[in-house]
Amino acid sequence: MSDSKSSIIDSHCHIVFSNFNEDREKVAERWRSQGVKALLHACVEPSEIPAIKSMADQFQELRYSVGVHPLDAHHWGPETLSVLKNAALDDSRVVAIGELGLDLFKAENLSEQLSILMPQLNLAFELKLPVIVHCRDAAKEMLEVFTKLSEHGCCPKGVMHCWSGNVKEMKEFLDLGFYISFSGNVTFKNAIDIHECAKKVPQSRFLVETDSPFL
């Protein structure tokens, strides 16, 4: 039996966040020693992009997305879509659009969140890039959006990040072609629905993430 470690991909992290300013190099040493071969940094708002790009220069394992998080909808402006598009076209290390989505757990501004979600989904479809989806207490609303886009043949594929839904919801997203990514919440003792999802998701659609520094 081989002694080599399996390759691990962290499908969602925020390594540029200030939480890592004191020990980022040591964190990199740890992920390398644990067999992490690639990391995907999820952008949450446009002002992050230069720092993420610089971080990708420093750490060759890093790839990244560009996008606006639903809880950062207030950062959206007239030029935002152009900024995201240009950033995606200018760097081949941009491999996704996001972190986009809906969050009705921490906010109730559904119409504002939808107003920045749709342009990003359209951009992803135009550029043929997958999306990184943040969906918290909003599975019904998110499924409605994706189902309508799918009916019109313009629904991008992607990953449901930090999955926290139930099996029924998961199957609906799987039917739309999405991957399911599990984070530290799958270890929570009372996260029964997430445990069941982790058991039932097809291996070919199963991703893992740290969502660092959060989980």
Residue ranges of each PLM-predicted region?
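Mid-domain alpha/beta scaffold segments of enzyme catalytic cores
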Residues: 1-215
